[in-house]
Amino acid sequence: MERETGFQQVLAGPGLRLEPLAAGHAAGLLAAADDEVFAHLPYPRPASIQEMRAWIEAALGGPQRRPYAIVIGEVVAGTSSYWYPDPVRGQIEIGSTWLGRRWWGTGANAEAKRLMLAHAFDALGFAKVAFRTDVANARSRRALERLGAHRDGLVLRDWPRPDGTWRDSVYYSILRAEWRRGDGGSPPDMGVSHGS
């Protein structure tokens, strides 16, 4: 499958689906967002429907990002993105993931990540998926470790925060061979549907 086409697919699992991000997701994302959700993100929380639409437009406008809305039932619960697809090195990053607090601790983040991992490895053909998170975000670090991601290192002063301080980031990764063996926190067949 051609990679660009692969980024336009809806990814469906048993509890949620990932839809390519669109302007129509703005109201749902705004309802899911609050200051605690955005506490460890390197950009400010959009506080109005106009700001959320601008945020979506910016997310869609960058050549290095392929964003998705996380949809549970018919409710937009959050977002996650593929970043920096590098076909030469065979790697891609998953990041800019956030969910409304209502879905914290429900398994939605893990399911979304597993859908994205399966799609990156099996449909898009990448050999490595990387992640990075704020060193201060213990919840995110634990979630990545439960997925089976390895801690690759710490990068100091990696991203400026909205308050002007600098974020140190912990880098993680999972290799395709580990994922296929089930070392990546998910058995090879998890009922993932690569819908249209």
What are the roles of these predicted feature ranges?
Residues 1-108, 119, 123, 128-129, ...:
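GNAT-family acyltransferases
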Residues 16-18, 144-147:
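Generic leucine side-chain signal with a strong bias for well-ordered alpha-helical environments
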Residues 105-119, 142, 146:
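Conserved acetyl-CoA-binding loop-helix of GNAT-fold acetyltransferases
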Residues 131-141:
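Conserved beta-strand-loop-alpha-helix junction that forms the acyl-donor binding cleft
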